[in-house]
Amino acid sequence: MNEVIILGREQFINKVLPKVDEVKNTFFISILEPDDDFENLHEDTENFKTWKFYDIEYDINNYKAITFEQAKEIYEFIKKNEGKNLICHCYAGVARSGAVGEFYWEMLGG
């Protein structure tokens, strides 16, 4: 049985990030705010990928929601890693990462 773990950013940074390169049969999705002070938490690899978009449904002035292209990239990354465990985080560990985790869980037959 595959695990889908959803975390907030601080939990991810403190508990998961130091062990990312050691974990087997797992892939990681990092969702950051576009104006975060850091570029990425980890370099993108076959098992780790970062996207940046705000937790909003549609663009509001300079605040950008997820784009169709980003959604497609996330889907393709998930398909490439299908069958592995997923650890996904966003700032609070609720909406964006929760939606990605729910999608993967349903894809696996949830």
Model feature map: region roles:
Residues 32, 54, 91:
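Anionic group-transfer/hydrolysis microenvironments
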Residues 78-108:
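Catalytic cysteine-centered active loop of the rhodanese-like fold, especially the PTP/DSP P-loop
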Residues 27-29, 47-51:
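Hydrophobic/aromatic beta-strand patches that form the interior of the parallel beta-sheet core
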Residues 41-43:
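Non-transmembrane, aqueous-exposed alpha-helical and coiled segments at domain scale
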Residues 49-87:
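Helix-loop module immediately N-terminal to the HCX5R catalytic loop
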Residues 1-37:
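Cys-based phosphatase fold recognition centered on the PTP superfamily
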Residues 37-39, 59, 95-99:
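Short catalytic/ligand-binding loop motif for oxyanion handling, primarily in non-cytosolic enzymes
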